[in-house]
Every structure is written in C-alpha cells, then in structure tokens.
UniProtKB/Swiss-Prot annotation:
Protein name (record): Protocadherin gamma-B3
Gene from which this protein is expressed: PCDHGB3
Region (Disordered): 791-838, 899-929
Chain segments annotated as transmembrane: 692-712
Signal peptide: 1-30
Amino acid sequence: MGNSSGWRGPAGQRRMLFLFLLSLLDQALSEPIRYAIPEELDRGSLVGNLAKDLGFGVGDLPTRNLRVIAEKKFFTVSPENGNLLVSDRIDREEICGKKSTCVLEFEMVAEKPLNFFHVTVLIQDINDNPPTFSQNITELEISELALTGATFALESAQDPDVGVNSLQQYYLSPDPHFSLIQKENLDGSRYPELVLKAPLDREEQPHHHLVLTAVDGGEPSRSCTTQIRVIVADANDNPPVFTQDMYRVNVAENLPAGSSVLKVMAIDMDEGINAEIIYAFINIGKEVRQLFKLDSKTGELTTIGELDFEERDSYTIGVEAKDGGHHTAYCKVQIDISDENDNAPEITLASESQHIQEDAELGTAVALIKTHDLDSGFNGEILCQLKGNFPFKIVQDTKNTYRLVTDGALDREQIPEYNVTITATDKGNPPLSSSKTITLHILDVNDNVPVFHQASYTVHVAENNPPGASIAHVRASDPDLGPNGLVSYYIVASDLEPRELSSYVSVSARSGVVFAQRAFDHEQLRAFELTLQARDQGSPTLSANVSLRVLVDDRNDNAPLVLYPALGPEGSALFDMVPRSAEPGYLVTKVVAVDADSGYNAWLSYHIVQASEPGLFSLGLRTGEVRTARTLGDREAARQRLLVTVRDGGQQPLSATVMLHLIFADSLQEIQPDLSDRPTPSDPQAELQFHLVVALALISVLFLLAVILAISLRLRCSSRPATEGYFQPGVCFKTVPGVLPTYSERTLPYSYNPCAASHSSNTEFKFLNIKAENAAPQDLLCDEASWFESNDNPEMPSNSGNLQKQAPPNTDWRFSQAQRPGTSGSQNGDDTGTWPNNQFDTEMLQAMILASASEAADGSSTLGGGAGTMGLSARYGPQFTLQHVPDYRQNVYIPGSNATLTNAAGKRDGKAPAGGNGNKKKSGKKEKK
C-alpha cells in the first residue's frame, strides 16, 4: 500500500516519467542510426546531423571527440557541429556490385564516457551507368530450314545499376523476318531472344542486318546498341537439345582451381557434321570467365580461380550447344557457393589513446575493441578473450564490440607498461583465431615520498674552512617520473638560533650539496644540527626530512697563551726570589699557560730555550714547574734568566715564549743593591717616596720574620717569608691575573693588573691602583687594603704618614695531598701528564675554566676553596676540580717558597688563621702600628 501510494504522488509520477524516458533513451542508443544518401555525392556533402541524432549538444562535441571507426572511411564527423559528412567517393557499383541493397555500416566512438554507436548508411543508386554490349557486332547464323517461331539467344547488355536504373528494355530494328522477345533470369535480369517470324530463304537474302538497342529505366534513360548480322545457313533440320534446362550445383568455397563443377550435355538427332555439338558460354561477364572454364567438346565445367563465399555466394551461367548444322540449344547453370571457415576473425582497436593513470579505479575503460569475421553462421561467431595474467579484463558490449577495462591495482613504479595480447576465436570447425598485442602505458601519479639515502647524516668540518665550500651532500630518491620525481632540497630547521641560519649554511635546491656561508670557529661553535627537507614537484607535494649533524673539528689555530709569569706595566719584567740554600728539586716557580684549542692541539709542553746558567734549573715538560737542578755555586751570579718556550701538540705546533728573571737571595735586603744598580736621575719627590717605602718594607720584614719564627716552632718545619716585590724602578714583583667581565675573541682571555712600580726617573716606588673592572678578584699575596696608592690618586694624600699597613703573608698555606700538582702531591719529577680520555673531557674542562673565570669576574671566587680547587684565588684563574689534567692545576706555586698551600680558613685581611694564636696577636700589633 505504501509503495503504490508513493507512485501516485507528484514525486512518483516524475519518477515513472524519468524511468520511461530512460528506457526510451536506452532503446534509442541500442538501435543503429540510419541514413540514406545517393551515390556519387561530392566530398563534404551532408549525410545527417549525427550529434543531434545521438542527443549530444554542440558544447559536448569537444569533449566527446566523435570519430568514425571503419576499415575504409567514407564519412567523417565535423567537430564544430557534429554533422556526418562524405569524405570519399562513393560508387555503389564498386562497393556493392549487383546487390539490390547497398548499405555501409560503421561504428561511431564517443569518449568521456567511452561509447559505441552503430550507424548504417543506405547507398541509393543513381543512373550513372549506361547499358553496354560486349561486342559492337554480333554474327548469328540461322539455317534456312529454321521454323517460324524459332528463337535465337542474343547477347545481353550489362548495366551495373540496379533497380529502375538497371536494364529494362530491348528494342530491335524493324525487320519482316525477325522479332524480339525478352525473358528474365532467376536473379531478375533480362535477356533478349530473336524470334523468326517468317521463313528464311538463303537464295533470296543470305544476310540480314539488325540493330539491337538496350534501354535502362533511369530518368533520363540511357541506352546502347549493337549490330546483329544474321547469316542464313544451309538446312539442318534437328537442333541440339540439353538434357536439362537448368543445372544446379553446390560447391565449397575452398574448392581448388581445376576442380570439376558439373557437366552439361546436349543431344542432336542429326548425324554427321550436323550432329557434332560445340559447347560455349553465353551471356556471361568477365568475372565468370576468370573463375570457370567450359570444355567445348565435353561440356565439363571446371574452376580456374578461387571461389570466395564472402565475395559472391552464387553464379548463374548461360551455356550454348551448337551442332554442325548451326542449330543451337541453350541452358542455364546455377552454381551456389557454400561457406567454409576460411577466414580468421579480425581485431580492430577503436580507441586511439593507450595510456592510463596508475590510480585508475577498477572498471575504467582502457581500450575499445571491435571484431569482424567474413564467414557466416557459426563460422562468423567470435569469442574475445585476454591471453596472459594482467590486471585487465574484457567486457562485451554488443555482438562484436568489447571494452578492455581495469581489473586490479596498477603501480607504475613496479610495472610501467603492459603488453596485452587480445585473442579472437570463431566457432568454426576447426576454429580459427587471431591475436593483437597492444602496449598500455601506465601514467605516473605522485604517490611516492622522497626517501633519503641515509637515515641521518653526520659530517666533520675542519674549522677555518673557506666560505662557500661544500661541507655535506644529502641525496634523496623519488621513483616517480617527471615533476613527481624531481627532488628539491631545503633547510627547514636548525639549532643555530638565535644565530641567523642563512649566514652559516645553505643548501643547493637541485643537488642537495650543503655549503658553508662562513668560516667556522671550533672555539665558538663546535657542532650544530640541521633539518633538511626533500620535496618533490608533484601535486600535492610530498616531502621527507632528515637530520644533518655538523661537527666542527679543531685546528691548531691558537698559540699557547702564557698566564704566568706576565709582564708588568709597559712591558716591565717580573722577578722570582730563590733562597741561596735551595736544595736540588726546589720548586722555584711555575709557568702557567693555556691554549684555546682542543685535544692534542691544546696539549702543552714546556722547554728551556736559553738559560744564563745552563744546568742550574730544570723544567717540567708537562707541568711547567721550574725547579733547581743543583745548588747555586759561590761564583755563579745571583741573577739568572731563563727563556721558556711553551708548545702545543698540533701537527704544526704553535708556541709562545716567556722570560723568567730569578734572583738568589735569602732576604729582601740582599736584593736591594741589585735592584738599585741602575743609576737614575735624582728626583726629590721620588726619593721621598722611596724612603717611605723602604721604611714600610723594613717594618713588614720584621713582622714577617716574627710570624715565620712562631709558625716554624709550631709546625717544626722551616719556611721563608714571601717577599712582596723588588723595589727598583721599572720592576714589578708579582702579577695578578684577573678575568675580564666580557670575553675577548679567544676562548680564555685573561687580564693582568700588576702591582708594579712605574717607570720614572727616580728610584722610588709607585703602586698603581687596580683597574675598576678588575677590582673584584683578590690577590693571593696581597689584598686591596695592602696596596700603596700613588700620589696620582686624588683621594689619597701624598704624605707617607697616612699610608696603610700591609698584611703579613699567610705562612700556613699548603697543598693537601689531593691538591698537589700532577697525579700525586708528592711527585716532583713527573714531567708527563695524563691527557683526558677524549675530546669530550677536554671540552668539559674548558667549559669549567670559562665558568670559573666568569665567577672570578663577579668576585665570587675565594682563596680557600674546597678539596681539589688547589687554593687558587680568582686572580690566578678559575678553580679546577678535575685532578687528571696537568695543564692548569699544576701551574700554581707560592713564589719564593717551597711550602705547599692548604685551605686557609681566614682571608688575607691582616688576621692569621684561626689555628695559630701567636700569629693572631702579632697581626693585631701590626694593625695598631
């Protein structure tokens, strides 16, 4: 009930109307489109509007691409309006011969979607051919004894036209002895016969001349004539007679040449020459004469050519029997040709394009196939199929039309093309078949992502590389074709931020070669990572990423930098004091140097280049420790010089040199004559300052002697007070390394603020102020409260009475066992250090040096560090916590003393360590002074 009510409404009526129209359209498309035209139309003549008859609009023509599929194209389709036009000469007689109906059949193909349309064109005959006789003159011999009413066969005229345009009538010129009758063959063609109206008399008229005219039925009619010459022969009263008026025979089309078809026979009751019969063809065309032969004596009909059912299926032949007396008889021979399976099927591809995209859906039409077999019946029925295993199949549309469609997934990267063999087989016995191979090209689509040849890339680049040099080459492959497989390379990310990426590296979009845009510095940038992207040119674009890690390898491009000893202001030399009683192995001083490079390029060695007294001192190869090799002789000079070279371990080693000035003396007073040997111009102000400084120095020496005596009694070990400086113009005692708040271009820059005497013309002391930016670090030997300010400082009066007192040195400085230079604190002769195991340890060490130097610049580094810091203040560089590196942690010593440092609890503020009460009391007295 619900369904019937749904069809009754407006929607149901529209649905029924749509189904009705759809059925009509389907019926119309399934039936062939028929046209009728006369033959011999001019080229370009209109046959019909095919597009309109197919239901196509003018706008659909460019996309549907209508075209004719036929073995011989007599027609074409106009792409502008869809008209079916004549493209070649159409001669009905040449195409169809004597067939009553001449039809040209062909297929029309339309694309998008792909469809077949069957078209038939009926070719109408026009009267374009006149009747013709094979001979202009025909001789006919008739016995004078011929009876009235006797008939004589005449040559028929041939007219290729059919229907009303064919031969319709024969006319004979008027004659009292003869008349003309017309008869029809089984096929409807007419032939004339001459009838004797009156007896002939050879003696009265031996010859008769007649004119035979053949006229067709066209409008206007066409005609032709032939001359008939009748010869009156002598009497022969018995004509031959055939055993049959019509002979019929059926032969196979594959009958070989020379085979007998049949035998005709005529009987003549006469005797002698009048009974001798001669057989001959009569009223036949040229085609029959090329296929058959008649024996004139026996009447046997044989083949001389190959019969073909597909060209013609039957022949009607006239045979004449003539005796010696010129009597004749006539019969007809009907030869029917039976079909044999002698024609293999023919395959025609109706589609021009043989390309298909690899992402085509199942059932997509690839090619249109048309088959044809000239045989008939079962011999002409065709089965079409594929040969081989392919992702395609054949779908039949009509009797002889098929579609090749996809039946599986296509992948151009695996199989770029298919050679498909199509086989058509008929149903004859035995069956015949034919094959045709077509090549189907698979069109590429962008379905493959570029793939890098490596999962990740790591390259090493030596620093100081030339800008623009290639540092890496990444490669990616894309199996697609054309733009889909054309790969371009881009840098999409890096860890160089906030640095500008374009100023460091670039990549060639075509080749994937990565170029350095600048020279890299291992000391500033040791490694960075890039993310490169390979992108194809397809639509949509597909891409893949890969990481490229660039490791900047170190080169030996930084020479060692000597931290200690350093030159004073204006290049003045520094001196170290050595006790005259120093035993062999006594630690005199230590050369401290650093190298901004890494690895073996920063592995330093120390060498004595020149010595004022060779053999007096030894130098640790790796530690830089200067020790006495023997005791000082009595005649040897107290003032010694050593020229020390520091070399790194690079392939082409770099070096730095430093001059050490050493004085053998047991007290400060002993060195004063050496310091004042140089004559200087007299300056009253300088002399005053000199006396003040000397007085202060004497007081300090007395105080230090008292402190040293107390400590020696307590600790039962001898020690010598450290001297603060040498009082001589142009000479400075100890330099104070301090770390700048901001680093220079090198990795570990140091600034040294010496506590030195200025170069003046008088033998006086001027103590310079510490620079403001370097004031935060504290000196190991004297703090800021112990410095004497020069008269150049406006905040300090020039009188010597207001000079501040210097705090005594801390005599309880010793290295612990863990703090001693080298691998153990007790060794002296170890000139080789243990280098870090790998570059990472070295880089970690340098990072710690930088961090410690930064703390020193902030004033946070103190003298008494924990275990492993070696007791260094910020002025002597960063606090070292690694015990296995001999470069920096061993290069610390107490100038002028062989005592080792320990962690002091108190600062150098004039107070002794908490462990010694006597020292504390003496320090308090000095403060009161």
